[in-house]
Amino acid sequence: MAISRGDLVRVKRPESYWYNEIGKVASVDTSGIKYNCVVRFDKVNYAGISGTEGGANTNNFAESELEKA
């Protein structure tokens, strides 16, 4: 499927906060690790620090858990 940096992708990992959301690939690691694609999203997740806005807006996924949007 050859996902590369800058591609817009849809997340297909059902347990992910960003399931079926579209994000932009920030980097792809070619060293052989399982979750080699770092994807950046516009919205943040629920993991913010208590009393502050925000949370994480990136996550690692395997190429098999992504499809080009």
UniProtKB/Swiss-Prot annotation:
It is found in: Cellular thylakoid membrane. NCBIfam families: PRK02749.1. The keyword Membrane applies. Its main location: membrane. Keywords: Membrane, Photosynthesis, Photosystem I, Thylakoid. Stabilizes the interaction between PsaC and the PSI core, assists the docking of the ferredoxin to PSI and interacts with ferredoxin-NADP oxidoreductase. It comes from the Bacteria. Pfam families: PSI_PsaE (PF02427). Gene3D superfamilies: 2.30.30.50. It is a peripheral membrane protein. GO terms for biological process: photosynthesis. One of its GO terms (cellular component) is photosystem I reaction center. This is Photosystem I reaction center subunit IV. Belongs to the PsaE family.
